[in-house]
C-alpha cells in the first residue's frame, strides 16, 4: 500500500517558485489534480507569478472546464497524460477504464484549445497486445492529436499485481533490476516474442515520427500553439 497522499503547503510552493530565476517550471507530482480543491487553490495562487509550467495528470481534466481553465490561466503549457494504449481491454486491466479511446480525440482537442501541449507514453507488452499493436498505436496517437510521445515496455515492479501475475505464471525472465527500465522485455509476452516486443517499440517511434506524420503534426501544432511554441516541441 502506498498510503495517503501528502500535499505540500501551497505558500511553500509559491515561495520556492518566486525565488527561482526562471519562468518555466515543472510541478512534479504523479497526479497533479488528484485533489481537485487543492489543484484549484494552487492554480489560483500561481496566476500572479506569470510562469509557464509542465505537470502530470489524467485525461479527466479535459472534461472539467473549471479545472482546465484554471490550469491554463495559471500557466499550464505542457501536460503528461496517461493514455498508454488504444486497447480498451488493456486499459481496463491497468485500472484505467476511465480512459475511453473513442473520446480521446475530442478531449485532447479541448486541451489544445487552452494552449496546452499533450505528451503521453505508449506502453507495450500488455497481454492483450499482438504484433500489430505498434503500428496501430502510432496511427491512433497521431489521429487523436498527441503532440509528443515515447514508447516504453511495461515494467513489472516487484510487489505489483503485474509482477505477482508473471511470477505465478513463471513468465519472469530477469532479476537484473538494471533491465527494468522500460526498454527491455524482462518477462515473456503473451502474444509475441521478447524480440518482437523490443523491436516493436522502436517501430512505433519510426511510424509516429515519420516524415509525413511529423509534417502533418507540425502544421496542426502551428495552428494550435503558434510557430514559436511549435518550434520548441521535440
What feature does the model see in each segment?
Residues 22, 76, 146-147, 154:
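Proline-aspartate-enriched helix->loop->beta-strand connector
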Residues 1-119, 124-126, 132-139:
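Radical SAM [4Fe-4S] cluster-binding motif and immediate context
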Residues 128, 155:
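Acidic, metal-coordinating catalytic cores used for nucleic-acid/nucleotide bond scission
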Residues 117, 132-135, 139-147, 158-234:
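C-terminal accessory regions of radical SAM enzymes
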Residues 87, 156-158:
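Short gly/pro/ser/thr-enriched loop/turn and capping motifs at secondary-structure boundaries
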Residues 55-58, 149, 153:
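A generic structural motif
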Amino acid at each position: 500500500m502506498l498510503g495517503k497522499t501528502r500535499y505540500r503547503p501551497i505558500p511553500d510552493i509559491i515561495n520556492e517558485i518566486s525565488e527561482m530565476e526562471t519562468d518555466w517550471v515543472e510541478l512534479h507530482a504523479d497526479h497533479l489534480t488528484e485533489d481537485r480543491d487543492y489543484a484549484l487553490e494552487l492554480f489560483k495562487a500561481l496566476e500572479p507569478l506569470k510562469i509557464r509550467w509542465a505537470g502530470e495528470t489524467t485525461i479527466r481534466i479535459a472534461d472539467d472546464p473549471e479545472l482546465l481553465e484554471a490550469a491554463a490561466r495559471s500557466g499550464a503549457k505542457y501536460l503528461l497524460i496517461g493514455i498508454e494504449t488504444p486497447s480498451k481491454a488493456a486499459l481496463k486491466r491497468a485500472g484505467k477504464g476511465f480512459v475511453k479511446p473513442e473520446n480521446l480525440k475530442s478531449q485532447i482537442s479541448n486541451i489544445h484549445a487552452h494552449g496546452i501541449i499533450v505528451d503521453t507514453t505508449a506502453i507495450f507488452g500488455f497481454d492483450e497486445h499482438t504484433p500489430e499493436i505498434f503500428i496501430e498505436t502510432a496511427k491512433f496517437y497521431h489521429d487523436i492529436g498527441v503532440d509528443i510521445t515515447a514508447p516504453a515496455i511495461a515494467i513489472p515492479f516487484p510487489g505489483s499485481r503485474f509482477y505477482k501475475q508473471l511470477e505465478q505464471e513463471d513468465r519472469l525472465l530477469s532479476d537484473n533490476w538494471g533491465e527494468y527500465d522500460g526498454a527491455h522485455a524482462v518477462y515473456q509476452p503473451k502474444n509475441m516474442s521478447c524480440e518482437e516486443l523490443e523491436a516493436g517499440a522502436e517501430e512505433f517511434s519510426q511510424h509516429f515520427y515519420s516524415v509525413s506524420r511529423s509534417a502533418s503534426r507540425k502544421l496542426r501544432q502551428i495552428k494550435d500553439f503558434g510557430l514559436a511554441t511549435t518550434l520548441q516541441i521535440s
